[in-house]
Amino acid sequence: MKRTHNCNQLNISNVNQEVTLKGWIKKIRKMGQITFIDLRDFYGITQIVVGENKQELINNLKPEYVISITGKVIERKSKNADIPTGEIEIEVKNIELINKSELTPFVIENDVEVSEETRMSYRYLDLRRQKIQNNMLLRAKVNSIIRKEFEADNFVEVETPYFGKSTPEGARDFLVPSRLNKNTFYALPQSPQLYKQLLMVSGFDKYYQIVRCFRDEDLRNDRQPEFTQLDMEMSFASATEVQDQIEKVIKKIFLEVKGIDFKEKLIKMPFREAIDLYGSDKPDIRFDLKINTLNEIFDKTQIKLFESFKENKLSIRGICVEELLSKKQLEILTETAKQKSFNNLAFAKFENGTWSGSIASSLSDGEKQALIKQFNIKDKATILLNVGKYEKISDMLGAVRNKVAEILNLADPNDYKLLWIIDFPLYEWSDEESRYVAAHNPFTMPNIKSIDDFETNKEDAIADSYDLVLNGFELGSGGVRITDSGIQQRMFEAVGLDDETIEKNFGWFINAYKYGAPNHAGFAFGIDRVIMLLTHSESIRDVIAFPKNSKGIDMMNDAPSYVEDNQLSELSIKTIK
């Protein structure tokens, strides 16, 4: 029979109607001569009651069997306010078995105790859990909001190629061998960067796309080898115009999904300020704990750890926690410092005028008073500090700062703090390649402040780029593009690309800019990460239908896998044993 309703649809107004529902058996409960079945489908749960004279209909039925039931809607005596159908139940007339199920490797419940490996191996069962299905529904809603907002502003959705050209800049490419063109490879896109820029050269005014991207990099909880991003570009636009557009969309997402109305413009924090105060270019500003430079306080110190910091051009930096941290908490924070290549984490505790801690006995009276004034200490505090090169000590204290917030629950999980990080360095030093490389990509316009000497003053060169940050996570990045051939040539030379390499890898791209290009700017943000944060998921894998594990393996189908020799032979490829 045809399904008349879903399992989340019926209520008290449907009493006495004959209905047909279809779904999975969630639970079977016998109470005397009566049996109750919780029937589940994608939409919800409805209770089915099987009377004494109908017990033969449920012989051999088990959880996760798929059935069709027909019966009459009746009012429940014992109501369940936790579900929309909790006022009614179905008095069964007939049950039809659609399909049986083997015993599942775990119970289909939200809070089931099962390893992630098992969940990923049986992802199709894991996806039956309401928690994971809700994540997929929210993801679909966010995608819908994005499309509506961009289309309302006259953006055109254009699909760009998945098979492209490998370039030496950026992360490792996933390569795809070509059978028809022997010994050649396509590269799966790390982003549609070059294609979307060419769309602007082609005369498109506003472009957007929800697109799958691929990066062959080390994985963690918020990374996957394939991921989805919102990609956009605008002709004749400044950085501010792009930021305004993205703000509008992200605020709409929060309003419709979380009911949060961001009325104020997002703050814009320069990169160097973010590093100085928070030790990170993606600061979590839900809590204070700002990093302070303490060089002046310890200018003439007798503390052995700090005594030669000036000669070695090092910085003494620290944070102040308005609590007395325990020995166990300090051990955890010291381990965090060690993960950032610092052997220890100095500390000093203050309580009602008394000092203690690893450096307390060596503090002079002047240093004590200066620390109290610097951190505005009242009754009690723990100061965490160390010495090192400015960038490294800032990075370490940024990690310690976040760990303190985690230990002391300083960050409200339902508080969302969005901000822009601007004025990024144009370059970053690559230890692996022993040269400066483009921090974002070699097509990002230098900031007007750096336009005259960006190829010679690399350490101070600033890019016209920007990141959107939420609660310590980078949501996305964008920038103004280089459209002047002279500036582009200077940029290529600055990152060590010779003419032959430029022509080989980018000739097809830069040639387009010889034919009249508008100034343009764009942005892209990771949809997977946005959904992860909106749902408070611990891992990005919980918001992707069929994810890979931390080793890039699909536990369900065992991809990547070996292929037959004849397949490799067709591609002129041999494997190295």
UniProtKB/Swiss-Prot annotation:
Alphabetical list of PANTHER family matching this protein: ASPARTATE--TRNA LIGASE, MITOCHONDRIAL, ASPARTYL/LYSYL-TRNA SYNTHETASE
Segments for region (Aspartate): 193-196
Location(s) in or outside the cell: Cytoplasm
Any one GO MF annotation of this record: ATP binding
Subunit note: Homodimer.
Pfam families, per database record: GAD, tRNA-synt_2, tRNA_anti-codon
Protein's UniProt name: Aspartate--tRNA ligase
Residues engaged in binding L-aspartate: 169, 215, 440, 481
Superkingdom assignment: Bacteria
GO biological process, one term: aspartyl-tRNA aminoacylation
Enzyme Commission number(s) from the entry: 6.1.1.12
The family this protein is said to belong to: Belongs to the class-II aminoacyl-tRNA synthetase family. Type 1 subfamily.
Magnesium as UniProt keyword: no
Catalytic activity: tRNA(Asp) + L-aspartate + ATP = L-aspartyl-tRNA(Asp) + AMP + diphosphate
